[in-house]
Amino acid sequence: MTRVFLTIDTELMWRHHVAGLDVDTIVARSLEPAGVGIAWQLAQLRRYGLKACFFVDPMPALVYGLDWVKRVVGAVLEAGQEVQLHLHPNWTRAKAGDGGANYAAFELIDYDWDEQIELIAGASDLLTSAGAPEPVAFRAGSYAASDDTLGALAELGFLYDSSHN
């Protein structure tokens, strides 16, 4: 039997933030686009008896609050699926309504060791604050991981990295 890992990056889309959309619209368009978002995916996983890992990026909570992350984490866990950590660092300087004018570097590889430790630890804290178990797996946004990322993950106790395309 062939084994596969079903993984789903779960994040708010930067392009909707840049377009200046309100948070409810950003959440809807990012997480439930065209009727095939998280709810549909969870229904299909349930229908076929499959398990998946949802890599959730909590960083937009720095801009839009934690409520939407709590809803995502709750829905995924209630469906018996797994939540792990995803991270797009550009959100650390974003501000609601700024049309994308304020942002940090988009790729994790553009941060040094200490900055990566701080970003990953902070994102992990946000995710657990939203109700997720302590994450043991990680996926960098844009799959942009470096040797520093792998070392930072090991230092922080992560067991798996999925930053590979």
Predicted feature residues:
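Catalytic alpha-helical scaffold of carbohydrate-active enzymes acting on polysaccharides/glycoconjugates
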Residues: M1-A137, Y143-N165
